[in-house]
Amino acid sequence: MIAILIFCLGVLGVIGMGATAVGAQSDARYRTDAANLTNDIASYIQLNADRSTLTNLKNTLDSFQHQPGGANCAFGGAASADAGVLGLLNKVVTVGPGLPGLPGSTAATQQITVDTTAAGFNRVQITICWQLPTDAAPRNQTLVTYVH
């Protein structure tokens, strides 16, 4: 009888470890997807910045800016004026089988800030957030790059 009890506890332990492994794998997938999405946005900005003059560079970087206000995954402000950036940001919220979107991500959980001041060195910061139904607070991925 005790042997059966010990066996059952062992089986339940193995099932619990399997569930934990699946959860960790899902978390890793979302972190990887978030890193890839922020990298895609940074690459787009690097490739499409107009570097012909300093004024043109500043203007194009400013056009990439998206919801520069707010903090902690509750962003606000004007949307980006660049259609390519908006298309990439839309991929973040497009969730479904075979789609790269992040669960719980909305338009208000994405931000691109640009600092074109002399002290900012054309710093671009891209933040995207997502939240699983089991998460108490949103998770985020932030990538910082400089455009010269």
Where are these regions (language model features)?
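N-terminal single-pass transmembrane signal-anchor helix
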Residues: 1-18
